[in-house]
């Protein structure tokens, strides 16, 4: 950790957390700044190369790492700053995220596989690109995510939004309808029905 954070100078970007450069690994390596999932992924790679028993954890509030020496309790690391995180702190984070009745459970601290880590990274990168209105790159993130979860209605809904911004209304309508059919009870479904009607009307006006 001293090598990574002090000698090499990696750190979490507190000033521009949602900057997409904090998710692109090449930019993280160049700038020495990132977010938990990008810094954590680099630490995982380095740790595995050096033989450390590191694992990724998709904690609700942010990506974490666990160091699991045989016969010892796991040590939880915050890759944003390299600090050890106690279970008391994790409980506090969970309460802040989910409410006062939230309880820290073993499943919150389970190790995850590489596809899950990639999925979390893609979601954060896509979110950053959407904030920056870089829709073509955001679409590539969604397409890549759908190779892992081809039928995920929420990912398909997001793809529909991106296609709408790219003025590809017919494809957007198709994606929105897929979400409405598969998640009829989601609050977003009613809003998307209105959006589909508006897009359909716009398409008809354009055709005429």
What is the meaning of each model-derived region?
Residues 1-208:
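A structural boundary/capping signal
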